[in-house]
Amino acid sequence: MIFLRYYIPARRINVAKLGLFIRKDWLDKLNMAEPTTTEEWVAYLRAAKEAKLGGEQTVPYAMKLYENSPLFSTSVIVDSFLDFSKITKEDWYSLYHEQMPGAKEAYRLLNTLYNEGLISENFAIDNGDIRNRDLNQGYAGFYIEGPTQVWPDYSDEMKKNVGEDAEWILLTPS
């Protein structure tokens, strides 16, 4: 018996991998535009910490590790540092992004941010409870999440705890 197989090539509605969410109200309080470069993003994180926009428990970058893929939430940052001129076709198919040329610089930056207290202190042992608390209580100013994340709704919960002007927006870096 012969089975015919058909397929329909399609462009999926959602092609985004991760969403970068930033506090609009914090940008307004800092009189800053949405960051479009790594340097502007780091400046925002530093300014948010210095201004203690989330109070004494301010966490500029709320991060957690994903059990199935611990480096998932850093992949957007790592990918932005990759030196595609040095990545071969073989590299692309045989290496993790974390091993590719340029990734080391991304991890140096993340290490610097952690040492400056700009990343959640316990991110490496957080199953999401601490990060979710920081998001809901208004302590955090930035986080990375899957683009289809609709549960829990951090915006509504944060508004209840912080006020109606508290708002997460999707960051679209260039």
Where would I find each of the regions flagged by the language model?
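Extracytoplasmic/secretory soluble proteins
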Residues: 1-174
